[in-house]
């Protein structure tokens, strides 16, 4: 199958001026857009038809040619080509600049690429580009060296002349002063007059001296500057530069602005520079080496690929097609235009003015100013606001530049390429459809008609209800009666997709078979609400229609709701009875002592009662009113399987349908068991929600999905039926306040008063008082709760609802009827005054306000949490999107050890509580062997519940399982390492996008995690929990309360100072001691297991193992990586993330977290490059690193040395090989800048890249191995296809040609291209 846009990779690079001119269809010379009278584009303007193509199909500008027959002609009057108007979306123009400008991305990005290339500081670069300083581009060293002595002599002569002049002037002035004084003396002037004259004379002489000295200093400065003149040197002083040019102009050239940068790049020798930098890296140290490494990255980029650094300085600016920056007329004659037109107009205006000034031969200062303005306008066009104040439009709004069009949520990448709107879709409010089967949904008639319109129209024409498509369309629009019959027919067997936003995991979109319903609301099956997280308080859902046969097949086979009963996160069923259904089944299976028609054994005076020969007889008795559903009876059963223990006792060969046995149970329970599959053992207990969950779990593990779907549907129907009959309602009368409440409160109030008195006397400090009060009132609340529980009758509806597990919990009941108890303030501390009223009695004003405090915090928290959790999911999806199952088995021997059970001192095994999320659904990596060496289960076997039970029975407590952490696949993971797909219960299929499933499984419960950081005991010691902790782990940040870990195994020496601990570890192997000092006493020492088995705080002389934590808090994952290596840090991260989710009662399988952690440790940082191409300090994929090293070693070279790095998910997503994926994630401009300089090529292997370019994603059924399937007929089919029909068919058909009628052996013919 061929793709429409079939290309293998996508490359990005720097465009040179020649490229830009080649793309262009003409130069834009005028800033005009359209003529305000005729509303036609101006010639040579930004919308010119001559450059960009005609505005109307097949019409030139002047109207000489109108019609398709002139296609391709260029009109000789107006120069417009006669073609489609669509070309205005793809034809580009350009602006020839009168002076070169630099591209702001490469100059202003951090780090400045231009600065690194030319070895100039960004500040200096800015001065040069924006005409604040001159830069020396070239010095003629040889000439200067040869003539230096002559020039020096000239300089000496000049200085001598200045000095002589100075001496002569001073001499003359001194003589004049003498003469003046003599004259004054002769006139007999006063002494102060004489003094003034003398002072004046001396002052003038001082000025003469200073002026001469300044002149000499300037000559010195000019000379020293000249002798030390070197390329890339900045001269900020304009006067100094002028003097240099006047005197020594022939020895050097200098310039300012982008032209000087262009010259520097032209003269730049990339090869030599790269060699120098490599040398510096080999021999250098410290800062110098770091700088060289960073520069080499940029220099080497230009050295290896076809990019020319000249692309960073532009001589021409491309103009994007006019349809991509449209101008639209609003009503009222005004125009709305894209900001780009404004930005382009500024560039053109300034460029034209600059051309004119140059032609006029204007003074350099004016020309330079205009060039600076041109540079600024091009900067604003590419990235407005990156440098200086942004250019604003009307209303002081910054204009959106080309970069802004790509960036952020509203940018091209995320808004248009990754989030397109879809045709054949609709949305409406949802209501419950309890009569539906699990795989059905109710679709409003009108909606269905609109969605299936083309199908209906075609069918109407086929059935001759309409002559042509047009009349069929009219029929549909007028909703003629025949249309509905046809719609029924078209809609059959055509699944539709339902989606509820926010789609947090893949079960947010499921396929259903539509059933037409009246009204305008979509009807949704009650059991799928859990997966969609939908309720019927006004939620809306969207409907999408899969069109192609493949899409319909996928929807039916993979997405049908009855095939998606299990959660992809934990493998537990999601389609479970909830709420009313649970209540109904709980009611049905309750047994009530002494109810009507109860079984009574035979006594002397009366026969036995309540014994029935079959369930049917019991039901008849119930219908007569002689028996209650919940009464205990004895009944003979033939169609229900006895419980396992009983079956073994009664039937040696096992039970078969039809064999009779007697059960002591209730009619309700018999009816419940009739809903289950026939071979499922009888369950004789009350159906709490947990029990129902256990049963469905069991069914999912043992029966095909179809059976499970049918069973849950039956349970739903029975649940609703009996919930209605049970008459469970809630009214005010059901909320009973316990009578002993007041007495309990008075007792505790007295205790609290005692504490308060102690506090007033100063016997307690504030904290102690608060803690005591909190303790007292917590006890009080608990006691009221107990009293409440004893006071309520068992058949109270509220208690029934809570006890059955339908909804609510006991705390809520206590709040309603008992007392609310203590509440927290926004800091999370308890307010020591309790709320003594219940909601039934009503709160006092003070209590009400205390209560609102915490409640509002809760609401604000939820809103923040939703946003944070969504962002976490987005980062997780981005980092893991290219983890796809690529092969069946990577053949690795490695795996990880998981615990199945805890071995007790007496040798018995207690099943580990976390088996469900660790060992379950994995593949064994080695044979599981019991104590006697017998193989219980061989390697490669899948660990389901039965297998785990078998291992525990054999006394095995540890097994080694395959894991994605140890998978050896180069790209993606293999099916055996991943193990069973949680959603299907079978080995994962090749092509499954396990990365995205993992991200969704971790992100979806994110909203349930708390935002808060808890305060637990101790001073100032916060335990970060909830969402912040998960983010901290996945971003690989240093934790907030970092705890040191032991670098080596050894004995601890602990010293206590005033404010700090100092811990020294003496290693067991006699190595160097490891010292940890300055450990703050605000963190407590860790509780560890001592060698004698007791637990206690770490103390002097204890023994610690490598990697043990020494203080309370969280270990820094980077430290764990350094001390214990990559495998340990992976296990550490998985464990820590699980801790957070388990604390919230969320069940996620370890394998999902492992997929993400695997992505965090994919890279290696190069320490020494050896004979490879890698740059030291660069990050490389582990697979690439290993294959390159193998290649070099095979050639006899020195391999590279590297160490694994742990990257946070954001950093890992940005470091991906695919620049398209990284650019559409975050920091778009930075990613594109880097990719362009390195001339990066995108192999299009991940999902996002393919979505962006509009190809099918390489996952699921879009993976190559499924799309390149060819159907080859079998021998029989070929024989059938190629025989000649015989005459007995009553058809006369002559023989064609000389063939015998035998099958043609197609295998002998090549299928290659016949050319």
Curated annotation (Swiss-Prot):
Query: What EC number(s) are associated with this protein in UniProt?
Result: 2.7.7.6
* UniProt enzyme class: transferase
Q: Which domain of life, per UniProt?
A: Bacteria
Q: What does this protein do?
A: DNA-dependent RNA polymerase catalyzes the transcription of DNA into RNA using the four ribonucleoside triphosphates as substrates.
Subunit record text: The RNAP catalytic core consists of 2 alpha, 1 beta, 1 beta' and 1 omega subunit. When a sigma factor is associated with the core the holoenzyme is formed, which can initiate transcription.
Q: Which NCBIfam families match?
A: PRK14906.1 (NF011498), rpoC_TIGR (TIGR02386)
One GO term in the molecular function aspect is: DNA binding
Entry binding sites for Zn(2+) 1: 60, 62, 75, 78
The protein here is known as DNA-directed RNA polymerase subunit beta'
Q: Which InterPro entries does the protein's record reference?
A: DNA-dir_RpoC_beta_prime, DNA-dir_RpoC_beta_prime_bact, RNA_pol_asu, RNA_pol_N, RNA_pol_Rpb1_1, RNA_pol_Rpb1_3, RNA_pol_Rpb1_3_sf, RNA_pol_Rpb1_4
- Which Gene3D superfamilies does the UniProt entry name for this protein? 1.10.132.30, 1.10.150.390, 1.10.1790.20, 1.10.40.90, 2.40.40.20, 2.40.50.100, RNA polymerase II, clamp domain, RNA polymerase Rpb1, domain 3
Name the positions where Mg(2+) binds. 535, 537, 539
Q: Name one GO biological process term.
A: DNA-templated transcription
SUPFAM superfamilies per the UniProt record, alphabetical: beta and beta-prime subunits of DNA dependent RNA-polymerase
Q: List the keywords (alphabetical).
A: DNA-directed RNA polymerase, Magnesium, Metal-binding, Nucleotidyltransferase, Transcription, Transferase, Zinc
UniProt family annotation: Belongs to the RNA polymerase beta' chain family.
Residue numbers binding Zn(2+) 2: 890, 967, 974, 977
Q: How is the cofactor bound?
A: Binds 1 Mg(2+) ion per subunit.
Q: Which reaction does it catalyse?
A: RNA(n) + a ribonucleoside 5'-triphosphate = RNA(n+1) + diphosphate
CDD domains, sorted: RNAP_beta'_C, RNAP_beta'_N
Q: Name the needed cofactors.
A: Mg(2+); Zn(2+)
- Record's GO cellular component terms: DNA-directed RNA polymerase complex
């Amino acid at each position: 199958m061929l793709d429409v846009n079939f290309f293998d990779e996508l490359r990005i690079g720097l465009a040179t001026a020649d490229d830009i001119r080649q793309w262009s269809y003409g130069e834009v010379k005028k800033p005009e857009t359209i003529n305000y009278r005729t509303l036609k584009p101006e010639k040579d303007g930004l919308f010119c038809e001559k450059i960009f193509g005609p505005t109307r199909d097949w019409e030139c500008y002047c109207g000489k040619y109108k019609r398709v027959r002139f296609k391709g002609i260029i009109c000789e009057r107006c120069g417009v080509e006669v073609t489609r108007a669509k070309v205005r979306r793809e034809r580009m123009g350009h602006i020839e600049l009168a002076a070169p400008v630099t591209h702001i991305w490469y100059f202003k990005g951090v780090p400045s690429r231009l600065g690194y290339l030319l070895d100039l500081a960004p500040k200096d670069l800015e001065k040069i580009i924006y005409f604040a300083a001159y830069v020396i581009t070239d010095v003629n060293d040889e000439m200067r060296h040869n003539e230096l002595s002559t020039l020096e002599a000239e300089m000496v002569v000049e200085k001598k002349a200045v000095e002589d002049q100075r001496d002569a002037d001073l001499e003359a002035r001194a003589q004049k002063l003498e003469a003046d004084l003599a004259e004054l003396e002769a006139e007999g002037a006063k002494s102060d007059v004489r003094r003034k004259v003398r002072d004046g004379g001396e002052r003038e002489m001082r000025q003469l001296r200073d002026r001469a000295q300044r002149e000499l200093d300037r000559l010195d400065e000019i000379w020293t500057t000249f002798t030390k003149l070197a390329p890339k040197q900045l001269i900020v002083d304009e006067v100094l530069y002028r003097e240099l040019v006047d005197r020594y102009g022939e020895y050097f050239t200098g310039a300012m602005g982008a032209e000087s940068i262009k010259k520097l790049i032209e003269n730049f020798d990339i090869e030599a520079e790269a060699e120098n930098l490599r040398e510096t890296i080999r021999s250098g140290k410290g800062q110098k080496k770091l700088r060289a490494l960073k520069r080499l990255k940029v220099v080497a980029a230009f050295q290896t690929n076809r990019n020319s650094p000249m692309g960073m300085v532009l001589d021409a600016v491309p103009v994007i097609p006019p349809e991509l920056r449209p101008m639209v007329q609003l009503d009222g004659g005004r125009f709305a235009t894209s900001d780009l037109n404004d930005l382009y107009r500024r560039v053109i205006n300034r460029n034209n003015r600059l051309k004119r000034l140059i032609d006029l031969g204007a003074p350099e200062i004016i020309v330079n100013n205009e060039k600076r303005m041109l540079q600024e306008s091009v900067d604003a066009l590419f990235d407005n606001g990156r440098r200086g104040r942004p250019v604003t439009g009307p209303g002081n709004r910054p204009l959106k530049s080309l970069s802004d069009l790509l960036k952020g949520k509203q940018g091209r990448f995320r808004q248009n390429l990754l989030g397109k709107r879809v045709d054949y879709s609709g949305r409406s409010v949802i209501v419950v459809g309890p009569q539906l089967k699990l795989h059905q949904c109710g679709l409003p008639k009108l909606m269905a008609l609109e969605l299936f319109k083309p199908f209906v129209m075609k069918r109407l024409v086929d059935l001759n209800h309409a002559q042509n498509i047009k009349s069929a369309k009219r029929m549909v629009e007028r909703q003629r009666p025949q249309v509905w019959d046809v719609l029924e027919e078209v809609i059959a067997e055509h699944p539709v997709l339902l989606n509820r936003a926010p789609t947090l995991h893949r079960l947010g979109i499921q396929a259903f078979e539509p059933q037409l319903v009246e009204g305008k609301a979509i009807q949704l099956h009650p059991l799928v609400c859990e997966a969609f997280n939908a309720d019927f308080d006004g939620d809306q859902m969207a409907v999408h229609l899969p069109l192609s046969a493949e899409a319909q097949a996928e929807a039916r086979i993979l997405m049908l709701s009855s095939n998606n009963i299990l959660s992809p996160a934990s493998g537990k069923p999601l389609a479970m009875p909830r709420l009313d259904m649970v209540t109904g089944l709980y009611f049905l299976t309750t047994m009530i002592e002494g109810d009507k028609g109860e079984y009574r054994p035979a006594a002397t005076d009366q026969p036995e009662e309540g014994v029935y020969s079959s369930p049917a007889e019991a039901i008849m008795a119930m219908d007569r009113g002689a028996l209650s559903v919940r009464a205990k009876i004895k009944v003979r059963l033939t169609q229900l399987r006895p419980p396992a223990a009983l079956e073994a006792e009664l039937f040696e060969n096992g039970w078969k349908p039809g064999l009779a046995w007697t059960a002591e149970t209730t009619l309700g329970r018999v009816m419940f068991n009739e809903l289950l599959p026939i071979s499922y053992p009888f369950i004789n207990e009350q159906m709490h929600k947990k029990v129902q969950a256990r049963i469905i779990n069991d069914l999912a593990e043992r029966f095909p999905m179809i059976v499970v779907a049918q069973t849950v549907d039956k349970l739903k129907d029975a649940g609703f039926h009996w919930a209605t009959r049970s008459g469970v309602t809630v009214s005010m009368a059901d909320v009973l306040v316990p009578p002993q409440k007041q007495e309990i409160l008075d007792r505790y109030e007295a205790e609290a008063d005692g504490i308060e008195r102690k506090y007033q006397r100063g016997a307690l400090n504030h904290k102690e008082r608060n803690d005591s009060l909190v303790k007292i009132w917590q006890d009080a609340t608990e006691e009221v709760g107990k009293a409440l529980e004893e006071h309520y009758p068992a058949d109270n509806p509220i208690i029934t609802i809570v006890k059955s597990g339908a909804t609510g919990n006991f705390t809520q009941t206590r709040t309603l009827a008992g007392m609310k108890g203590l509440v927290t303030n926004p800091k999370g501390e308890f307010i020591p005054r309790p709320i003594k009223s219940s909601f039934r009695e009503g709160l006092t004003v003070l209590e009400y306000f205390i209560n609102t405090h915490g409640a509002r915090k809760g609401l604000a928290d939820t809103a923040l949490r939703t946003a944070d959790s969504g962002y976490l999911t987005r980062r997780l999806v981005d980092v893991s999107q290219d983890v796809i199952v690529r092969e069946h088995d990577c053949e690795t021997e490695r795996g990880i050890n998981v615990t199945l059970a805890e071995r007790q001192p007496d040798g018995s095994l207690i099943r580990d509580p976390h088996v469900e999320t660790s060992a379950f659904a994995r593949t064994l990596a080695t044979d599981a062997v019991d104590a006697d060496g017998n193989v219980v289960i061989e390697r490669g076997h899948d660990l389901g519940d039965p297998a785990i039970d078998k291992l525990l029975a054999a006394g095995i407590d540890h097994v080694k399982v395959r894991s994605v952490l140890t998978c050896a696949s180069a790209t993606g993971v293999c099916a055996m390492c991943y193990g069973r797909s949680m959603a299907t219960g079978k080995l994962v299929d090749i092509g499954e996008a396990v990365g995205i499933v993992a991200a969704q499984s971790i992100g979806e419960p994110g909203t349930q995690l708390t935002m808060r950081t808890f305060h637990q005991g101790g001073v100032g010691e916060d335990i970060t929990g909830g969402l912040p902790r998960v983010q901290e782990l996945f971003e690989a940040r240093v934790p907030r309360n970092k705890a040191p870990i032991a670098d080596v195994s050894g004995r601890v020496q602990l010293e206590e100072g005033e404010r700090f601990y100092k811990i020294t570890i003496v290693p067991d192997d006699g190595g160097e001691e490891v010292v940890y000092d300055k450990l703050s006493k605000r963190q407590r020492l860790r509780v560890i297991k001592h060698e004698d088995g007791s637990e206690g705080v770490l103390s002097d002389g204890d023994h610690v193992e490598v990697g043990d934590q020494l203080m309370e808090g969280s270990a820094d994952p980077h430290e764990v990586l350094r001390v214990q290596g990559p495998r340990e840090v992976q296990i550490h991260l998985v464990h820590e993330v699980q801790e957070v989710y388990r604390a919230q009662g969320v069940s996620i399988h370890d394998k999902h977290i492992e997929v993400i952690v695997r992505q965090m440790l994919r890279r290696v940082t190069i320490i020494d490059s050896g004979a490879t191409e890698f740059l030291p300090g660069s990050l490389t994929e582990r697979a690439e690193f290993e294959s390159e090293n193998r290649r070099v070693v095979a050639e006899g070279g020195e391999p590279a040395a590297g160490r694994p790095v742990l990257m946070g998910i954001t950093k890992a997503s940005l470091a991906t090989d695919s620049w398209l994926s990284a650019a559409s994630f975050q920091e778009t401009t930075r990613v594109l800048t880097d990719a362009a300089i390195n001339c990066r090529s995108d192999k299009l292997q991940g999902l996002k890249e393919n979505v962006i370019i509009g190809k099918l994603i390489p996952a699921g059924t879009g993976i190559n191995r499924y799309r390149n399937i060819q159907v080859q007929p079998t021998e029989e089919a070929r024989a059938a296809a190629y025989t000649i029909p015989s005459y007995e068919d009553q058809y006369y058909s002559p023989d064609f040609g000389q063939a015998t009628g035998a099958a043609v052996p197609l295998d002998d013919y090549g299928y290659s291209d016949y050319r």
